[in-house]
């Protein structure tokens, strides 16, 4: 009888444990270098950075700018302006929606008073429904932030 009781208790203990499985994992994005025909580059932010998500995207854009936006010219300046970052999230029971809109302006100034301006925007959103962990929400946010910058990266690479 005692062995049956131990077996039942072990079975209940194992069966009642909540799964720790994450539904959304961090994605890995690869960025190629983008080369501009300028001598210098500068990053300017026209948005107010307050929330942790805004801090994350600001730092991510700075790293992307420093590591993947390259200059290889003899004259001119590249000014990259973060023009807009809008984020919204809706949290309800068993439902989470996150959206992000980003606009970045690329201004290429030359000495002969010619300039080119590219205004590039990206919008992303994601939804989680059902049983999910807070880590899933954070992973969704980070993935969407990086995906929006990847879209901007691809659009500007095609434009120049």
Language-model regions, residue ranges each:
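Alpha-helix initiation/capping motif
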Residues: 26-27, 54, 133
